[in-house]
Curated annotation (Swiss-Prot):
The gene is HYP2. Lys-51 undergoes hypusination, a unique post-translational modification that consists in the addition of a butylamino group from spermidine to lysine side chain, leading to the formation of the unusual amino acid hypusine. eIF-5As are the only known proteins to undergo this modification, which is essential for their function. This is Eukaryotic translation initiation factor 5A-1. There are two genes for eIF-5A in yeast. Changing C39Y: Temperature-sensitive growth phenotype. Lethal.
Length: 157
């Protein structure tokens, strides 16, 4: 055994931020990429095969980061990109300069997530100012991250 210390950099092994899926296999409440944005499908309908061509799938989806509504119409046999979406919970340490200071279960800190805007941001700030121990849910897809919800951490008394 050697006494040398080894440090290993973590990497994503070159994995893609999306994967292909046939239109007909997409489902409501699933995720899809429309206009290069990761979206959650809120409504979908299929039109019958016409005289020329394939059955079409009409998708209505909401951008998971901006909340904007996007629509797409595509043949059911075509492939669409589906984003790899991850949800992680972090303990909130601080809110500083519009950014959240977070800690994961391993004790690693993360300071690059923007504080949410609007009602969620206001209620998060209020709960934090009241001294509550908070867990924040962060959703990440296609290189973007955002806080989508928070809850009071369970007490371990």
């Amino acid at each position: 055994m050697s006494d040398e210390e080894h440090t290993f950099e973590t990497a994503d092994a070159g994995s893609s931020a999306t994967y292909p899926m046939q239109c007909s296999a997409l489902r409501k409440n699933g995720f899809v990429v429309i206009k290069s944005r990761p979206c959650k499908i809120v409504d979908m309908s299929t039109s019958k095969t016409g005289k020329h061509g394939h059955a079409k799938v009409h998708l209505v989806a909401i951008d998971i980061f901006t909340g904007k509504k996007l629509e797409d119409l595509s043949p059911s046999t075509h492939n669409m990109e589906v984003p790899v979406v991850k949800r992680n919970e972090y303990q909130l340490l601080d809110i500083d300069d519009g950014f959240l200071s977070l800690m994961n279960m391993d004790g690693d800190t993360k300071d690059d997530v923007k504080a949410p805007e609007g009602e969620l941001g206001d209620s998060l700030q209020t709960a934090f100012d009241e001294g509550k121990d908070l867990m924040v849910t962060i959703i990440s897809a296609m290189g973007e991250e955002a806080a989508i919800s928070f809850k009071e951490a369970a007490r371990t008394d």
